[in-house]
Amino acid sequence: DLLVDEDAMVLALKKGKVKRYVSDFPNPTTAGAKGCIVIPHLGASTEEAEENCARMAVKEVRCYLEHGNIKNSVNYPDCDMGIPSYPARVAICHRNVKNMLSQFTTILGQANYNIGNMTNKSRGDYAYSMFDLESPASRELVEQLEAVDGVLKVRVIC
């Protein structure tokens, strides 16, 4: 039921035929062998792993909904500004094209919003920007941001 003949692997490591062996299932044969790198076993197909993944997914979706932070998304990059500490956080999902940030900051500045903190992350064709503002975001501000070509979604987190 093993995927690797561990005795043969240790011998191959000793003879230099294999330089490194990475395993997520440590055992007495390979754990102490020179050239063997042992990592934590994720057990991805076990019932426990499925429960852990479900808990993790709930935690990450909750963090996105409550704070705007993204973690482990398939189509957006990880983006974390922690728990909001300003009166407003505005999150913008948009296309990853030139001049998006300058358009956002111009709109914010012209509407007399001061940015306390901000971040922008991209992955492929998409990007995600968050702005912590020193005053609450108005409906008019959201409408101006939504009107920018390439914006997919604007969310006011708080």
Model-inferred region functions:
Residues K71-C158:
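A conserved regulatory-domain signal marking ACT and ACT-like small-molecule sensing domains
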Residues D1-P84, Y128, D132, C158:
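Rossmann-like dinucleotide-binding domain for NAD(H)/NADP(H)
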